[in-house]
Amino acid sequence: MDHQMKNLLERLFVRDQHVCPWWCCFTFDNFLRKLFHNPEKILRPYILKGSTVLDIGPGMGYFSIPLARMVGETGKVIAADVQPEMLRALWMRAKKAGVEHQMITHLCKTDSLGLNTQVDFVLAFWMVHEVPNPFLFFKEIRSLLQLSGKFLLSEPILHVNQAMFEKTVKTAESCGLTLMEKP
C-alpha cells in the first residue's frame, strides 16, 4: 500500500482525536442510515414532551430534528457543536422541518461545552472519541444533567474498539455517571 493511501486510511479509521469536518456530514444523513440508527427507536424511550435535551456534536441535525419533534412545542433541544458551519446547516434544516422554535444552537469551545442549563437528556452520538479530555467532558455533562436525567453514549466501531469503549464508560462512571444499560 502506498504511503498516501496508508495516511488516508489512518486518518479515516485510526482511533485518534479529530473532529469530523462539517462537509463530511452530508454522507451521514442519508436514507440508509435510518435502517441502522432510527432516531425514533433509539431515543423515544428516554424523551418526554416538554423535556430539555442536549445533543452534543449534532452534525446537521440527524437526531436533533427528530428530538425537537419528540419534545414538542414546550420542550427544547440544545444542539451544541464546535463548528459554526455545522450549526448553520442544522438551523436551516430545523427551519425547513418546522421545529426551529424548539431548537437552540450553541457554539462550544473545543475544551468546554460552555453551558449552564440543566437538561433532562444528553445525547453524545459518535463524538466522544473527538473530545480532547473525556474526563472533563463527562464532568461537565454530569453537572448539566438533572438528578433523574439520562445520558446516551454511542461510538462508531470503526473508530472505537470494544476496549476503548469500555475505558470511555469507566471514565464516565468516574465522573458520577451510572451505566444503566447496554445494547
Tell me what each language-model feature is.
Residues 120-132:
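A short SAM/SAH-binding and catalytic strip from SAM-dependent methyltransferases
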Residues 135-147:
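A short glycine-rich, Lys/Arg-flanked "PGG" loop and its adjoining helix->strand segment in the class I
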Residues 54, 60-112:
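Class I SAM-dependent methyltransferase SAM/SAH-binding core
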Residues 33-49:
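Conserved alpha-helix/loop element of class I SAM-dependent methyltransferases that forms part
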